[in-house]
Amino acid sequence: MTSIDWRSALTDDEQGSIRDIVAAATRHDGVAPVGDQVLRELPADRTRHLVAVDPDAGAVVGYLNLAPASDTAPPMAELVVHPDFRRRGTGAAMARAGLAEGGTHARIWAHGNLEAARATARTLGLQVVRELLQMRRPLTDLPPVTVADGVRLATYSGPGDDPELLRINNSAFAWHPEQGGWTDADIAERRAEAWFDPAGLFMAFDDASGKLLGFHWTKVHGPDLGEVYVVGVDPAAQGRGLGATLTLTGLHHLAERLSNSPQPTVMLYVEADNGAAVKTYRRLGFDVSSVDAAYAAVAD
């Protein structure tokens, strides 16, 4: 019988096994079962770790990460079970344990909202409380970039830019459960990632004052796929077309980075209920490719 136990910290071997499970599930499902932040948390002790071990296989076969509540987000769980060990009730048992540990307001992500996740949600009496759209478009036939008078574009020059990046990010995303409330450590962690490229972090400055107005952080996932990772604009600078300028600047950069691909593609994530942003991205040629759903217990 599979054992399921909480850990405050993971061993190196457990971390390696979990990364392997995530990779296997991604290949099997066509969508990553957990977000990048979960992988960053594996060696840390900021979150809780629920590990499922199959005694016959002598191996980790499932993992749930439980992030504590923050000022902008409730407790959030993310879950993966190895494809070879599914349909045994492990996923449902882990989801039930994670939500119980997280408390009344806890939520659990279903990346791609696949049928298996929907079935588990029905079994546990959960309902969708939030949806995140993944949108994509080809990196071909891009509109030209237009830069307004008085705006200067540059790329990230190093940690000296971080205070202004944090100011813009935390004002633009004060409402956002994951993106809001960043600290220096959040930028430093991402700067240490293998994918980080300072030439792909674009910044728009006001020529007169020198103040940062907005930024677009791009990400390359592989030879065929790039991402609009974050676009943030100072709320005080809204209405100047900066979002479109920064987005298109990043798209042209990604198109150049992926120029050897026969089908270069860019993706982004946007809240399903952010109608204005969805409309803007549709105008730029993006279409919905998948939906991530956050589930929570139905209130009595």
Curated annotation (Swiss-Prot):
> Which reaction does this enzyme catalyse, per its entry?
1D-myo-inositol 2-(L-cysteinylamino)-2-deoxy-alpha-D-glucopyranoside + acetyl-CoA = mycothiol + CoA + H(+)
The UniProt entry, under InterPro entries, shows: Acyl_CoA_acyltransferase, GNAT_dom, MshD_Acetyltransferase, Mycothiol_AcTrfase
Which EC class is the enzyme in?
Answer: transferase
Q: Which residues bind acetyl-CoA 1?
A: 79-81
What keywords appear on the UniProt entry?
Answer: Acyltransferase, Repeat, Transferase
> Which positions in this protein are listed as binding 1D-myo-inositol 2-(L-cysteinylamino)-2-deoxy-alpha-D-glucopyranoside?
36, 178, 219, 227, 269
Q: Which domain of life is it from?
A: Bacteria
E.C. code = 2.3.1.189
Residues engaged in binding acetyl-CoA 2: 231-233, 274-279
Q: Name one Pfam family in it.
A: Acetyltransf_1
Q: Which GO terms describe its biological process?
A: mycothiol biosynthetic process
Subunit organization: Monomer.
* Listed NCBIfam families: mycothiol_MshD
Cited HAMAP family: MshD (MF_01698)
Record-given protein name: Mycothiol acetyltransferase
Q: Which gene encodes it?
A: mshD
